[in-house]
């Protein structure tokens, strides 16, 4: 039922408003991903904090809920019936920026609750708001749509902002830019979040051209600021943060803000070619997007020092259905993760070999007393190269004779 509803919504939205669908990243999340993320989050919650998603004082937020997929899965298969009424009323939260999925999510969540509990209860913790505008504690949502300004919705946002969020889980939009400038379909600006990105991720980057205003970068920055002092962020998104040069500052910053990271790299990057493209395999979103995808879990623990990265990558050449089956048949605790130790340049994979840095340099411009050579020159160089090649052999021979004769006449 969930898959049917999500596919129906996705196809309708793309036909009804294709630009909004593209800008908002309207792609439904496969159930295999949703269940794996929820089960893994539950495992990490218990491992690190001795709690589960069904416990009191564990507030859960889906910041880009779409049709409510993550919330309905939590209600239907994660929280026991005896705990659900309290969680539903107080500690499960969802945000949605578009009116159509907002209504679908509300109905979907309420129907799932009724099916499990046997009676209807309005879900009053879903907010019609652009999460990225809700930059605590500066505002209770700056969205200009009139619906967001109703007193009921404003009170919902205010109530959510007063909660300490322990788990942020979901599938944030990935689409960073339209395909070309003529599409007139750019993502809007978010001054507060973009400033936070500039002051953190970009400030700590060594890349000459660093553009980190992708939607998923914004949601990661927002979630990192919103999560409680003890909590977990569980996202599925573009995987470029794993090895992209422009994300070196991001990798450095999260090592300072979090204590543990688990990554399952699902590959699927279609923006490659040749053998590399074949190794990437199918995209787990049924090849509806072209970027590589990763599922990851960030753990934040108050008073704990250090940062550990655990990395698992899917096998080469696997099809989308094989990747879904991998998530369906594996538990996070049973996955064979590699413990990654970042290098000095904040690389996680494709680590740089730094052995040469300890050797005596041939020449050091800044300190020639600590080098093998103390003089340097540009060596043999050529000039007037156009004199020594030509399309005609006869013309070339004539040029060279003239060149040699001219030189000898000056000696």
Q: PLM ranges: what are they?
A:
Residues 3-264, 273:
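SAM-dependent methyltransferase catalytic region
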Residues 124, 163, 180-182, 203-206, ...:
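Sequence-level detector for compositionally biased, low-complexity segments
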């Amino acid at each position: 039922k969930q898959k049917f509803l999500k596919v129906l919504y996705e196809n309708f939205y793309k036909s009804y408003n294709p630009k909004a669908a593209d800008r908002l990243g309207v792609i439904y999340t496969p159930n295999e991903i949703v269940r794996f993320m929820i089960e893994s989050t539950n495992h990490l919650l218990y491992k690190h904090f001795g709690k589960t998603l069904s416990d009191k004082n564990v507030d859960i937020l889906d910041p880009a809920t779409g049709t409510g997929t993550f919330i309905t899965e939590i209600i239907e298969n994660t929280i026991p019936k005896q705990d659900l009424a309290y969680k539903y009323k107080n500690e499960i939260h969802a945000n949605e920026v578009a009116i159509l999925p907002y209504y679908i999510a509300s109905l979907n969540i309420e129907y799932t609750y009724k099916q499990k509990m046997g009676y209807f209860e309005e879900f009053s913790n879903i907010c019609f708001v652009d999460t990225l505008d809700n930059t605590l504690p500066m505002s209770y949502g700056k969205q200009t749509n009139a619906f967001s300004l109703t007193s009921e919705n404003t009170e919902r946002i205010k109530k959510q902002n007063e909660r300490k969020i322990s788990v942020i889980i979901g599938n944030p939009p990935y689409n960073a830019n339209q395909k070309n400038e003529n599409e007139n379909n750019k993502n809007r600006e978010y001054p507060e979040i973009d400033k936070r990105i500039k002051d953190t991720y970009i400030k700590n980057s060594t890349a000459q051209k660093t553009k980190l205003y992708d939607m998923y970068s914004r949601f990661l920055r927002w979630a990192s600021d919103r999560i409680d002092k003890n909590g977990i962020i569980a996202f599925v998104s573009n995987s470029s943060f794993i090895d992209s040069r422009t994300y070196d500052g991001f990798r450095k910053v999260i090592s300072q803000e979090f204590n543990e990271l688990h990554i399952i790299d699902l590959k699927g990057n279609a923006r490659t070619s040749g053998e590399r493209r074949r190794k990437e395999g199918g995209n787990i979103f049924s090849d509806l997007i072209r970027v590589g995808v990763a599922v990851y879990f960030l753990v934040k623990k108050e008073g704990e020092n250090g940062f550990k990265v655990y990395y698992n990558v899917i096998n080469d050449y696997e099809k989308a259905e094989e990747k879904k089956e991998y998530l369906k048949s594996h538990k996070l605790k049973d996955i064979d993760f590699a413990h990654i130790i970042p290098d000095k340049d904040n690389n996680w994979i494709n680590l740089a070999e730094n052995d040469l840095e300890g050797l005596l340099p041939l020449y050091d411009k800044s300190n020639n007393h600590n080098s093998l050579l103390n003089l340097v020159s540009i060596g043999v160089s050529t000039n007037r190269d156009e004199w020594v090649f030509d399309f005609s052999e006869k013309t070339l021979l004539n040029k060279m004779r003239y060149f040699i004769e001219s030189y000898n006449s000056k000696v």
